[in-house]
Amino acid sequence: MSEDTVFTVAGQDWDDVVDAVKASSGGGGSEGGEERIVVNMGPQHPSTHGVLRLILEIEGETVTEARCGIGYLHTGIEKNLEYRTWTQGVTFVTRMDYLSPFFNETAYCLGVEKLLDITDEVPERASVIRVMLMELNRISSHLVALATGGMELGAVTAMLFGFRERELVLDVFEMITGLRMNHAYIRPGGLSQDLPEGAVEKVRELLALMPERLRDMENLLNDNRIWKGRTQGIGYLDLTGCMALGITGPMLRATGLPHDLRKSQPYCGYENYEFDVSTDTGCDAYGRYLIRVDEMKESLKIVEQCLDKLRPGPIMAEDKKIAWPADLTLGPDGLGNSPGHVREIMDSSMESLIHHFKLVTEGFRVPPGQVYVAVESPRGELGVHMVSDGGTRPFRVHFRDPSFTNLQSVAATCEGGMVADVIAAVASIDPVMGGVDR
């Protein structure tokens, strides 16, 4: 594209764009179709999953070049972690990939525990609850992927189904942690608090209802001619391309490779759970859709096993240099700390109060060293590289977010295809910009 044939248009209907190009190229002759136009899709666009900017060079209806513009949701989380204690860091990392907060928290806490060398001291009950919450979170995240992907292709019913079912999962999260998102519930050494009364029954109700709701979603889309026409063969990326770009998650498993960190590098006791790794050989958007639906079914199986494994016991490591002296719980009026918590800290001894004050304000010290820990998030390998200089704050924390890595496949999956298929290709990647920009 030469410098004299650059057309800048914004906020117009597509027909207006085409007319402007034809008018500029000499009255609508055949040469108009040969011109290449650069179009900005986003960052404010209903089909780009947040503030993602796609720079598309198109010739007619064909995409000749596709690039990503990121950084519109940069929040400086990794830098902020260097100015907070190890425990306070959980409050930040849970806000990165905001659709799968429990995975952010678990990856971070597993890294801190590895540096402290207390991985084996985390109580079994805490690990079981972590797995249960992560798998419920996988379901809620995949439901958003299917709902938004369906909406962008015109399947409004799929969007309604997806968000309706997600509400059921978020109700469970709200009951257990007090929040629908950004929980900060998982802490280094265990959990912030135990399951409330009635939580297990609430999860069992969800397990009874969800399989039927997932079948409704499958009946709606699996054999739908329009859905298959818009997704089969779209966003194609084979195993060679995935390996070259470092792609993980459903995109990689859609090539037929059963790569799942829960199986290859088990954490939180995943080796003790029975589940299958979902794969497909389509290498396209339709295959990724099938994998996400199948993964939700497998997650339900894992959650059921978690409920069977739940045994009474502590939910925090016993090391008093790490664990707070008492569980923080609300008072009977819903405000302030409970009388039991205050009594535990203040009535026992002055030393206990001093210890609690120092532990909360200054934080615990972590031995110098560095670790890399990874978990299997709904989008792929979520890794954390953590460096400690022996202080009460991290020296450096870097996250390998799967959305960031997987977005590098945009050029490979979109170039040479049609403009309309860019929407389906990006939706099948399922990027979350909070994790990309951090």
From Swiss-Prot:
Belongs to the complex I 49 kDa subunit family. This is NADH-quinone oxidoreductase subunit D. It is a peripheral membrane protein. Keywords: Cell membrane, Membrane, NAD, Quinone, Translocase, Transport. Gene3D superfamilies: Cytochrome-c3 Hydrogenase, chain B (1.10.645.10). Its EC number is 7.1.1.-. Its main location: membrane. SUPFAM superfamilies: HydB/Nqo4-like. It comes from Rhodococcus jostii (strain RHA1). It comes from the Bacteria. GO terms for cellular component: plasma membrane. It is found in: Cell membrane. NDH-1 is composed of 14 different subunits. Subunits NuoB, C, D, E, F, and G constitute the peripheral sector of the complex. GO terms for molecular function: NAD binding; NADH:ubiquinone reductase (non-electrogenic) activity; quinone binding. The keyword Transport applies. NDH-1 shuttles electrons from NADH, via FMN and iron-sulfur (Fe-S) centers, to quinones in the respiratory chain. The immediate electron acceptor for the enzyme in this species is believed to be a menaquinone. Couples the redox reaction to proton translocation (for every two electrons transferred, four hydrogen ions are translocated across the cytoplasmic membrane), and thus conserves the redox energy in a proton gradient. It catalyses: a quinone + NADH + 5 H(+)(in) = a quinol + NAD(+) + 4 H(+)(out). The keyword NAD applies.
